[in-house]
């Protein structure tokens, strides 16, 4: 048996969504959605606010396996889809919303800082696009050899 420590890498995903009403319009109800999803027993993901009040973000917890990462994520995503549907909302992800975007930007300290760095116009653009982020963490001590 080798005396070397097991080297692990970690994977994670983030998926951002616009919230839409039954007519396909963006709605600024993220705080309400976060409230009712907080009461659900989501074991594999965290639901977070985004820079706009018509957006939410689903974040996986770090995994060592691609297979478990995605299967666990989609189990909880199914619950999120069910809850938003029951509350007469739809999720729209990956890209920019094609209609009129009435997104209200947040004024938390974190977002005020981003606005100062990016400028008002560029910061507002952040509230007009949603994406998918796939994170890969290199094994610890990768560059120490």
Where are these regions (language model features)?
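Terminal catalytic/cofactor-binding subdomain
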Residues: 1-122, 128, 145
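An acidic/histidine-cluster motif and surrounding catalytic segment
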Residues: 134
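Inter-helical turn/loop segments and adjacent helix faces that build the functional surface
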Residues: 138-145
């Amino acid at each position: 048996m080798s005396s070397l420590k097991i080297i692990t890498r970690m994977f994670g995903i983030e998926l951002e969504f616009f919230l839409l009403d039954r007519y396909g319009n963006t709605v600024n109800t993220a705080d309400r959605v976060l409230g009712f999803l907080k009461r659900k027993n989501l074991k594999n993901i965290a639901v977070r606010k985004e820079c706009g009040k018509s957006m939410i973000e689903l974040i996986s917890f770090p995994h060592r396996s691609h297979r478990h990462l995605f299967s666990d994520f989609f189990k909880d995503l199914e619950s999120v889809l069910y809850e938003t549907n029951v509350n007469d909302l739809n999720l729209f992800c990956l890209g920019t919303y094609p209609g009129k975007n009435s997104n209200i930007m947040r004024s938390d300290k974190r977002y005020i800082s981003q606005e100062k760095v990016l400028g008002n116009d560029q910061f507002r653009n952040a509230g007009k696009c949603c994406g998918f982020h796939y994170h890969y963490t290199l094994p610890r001590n990768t560059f120490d050899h």
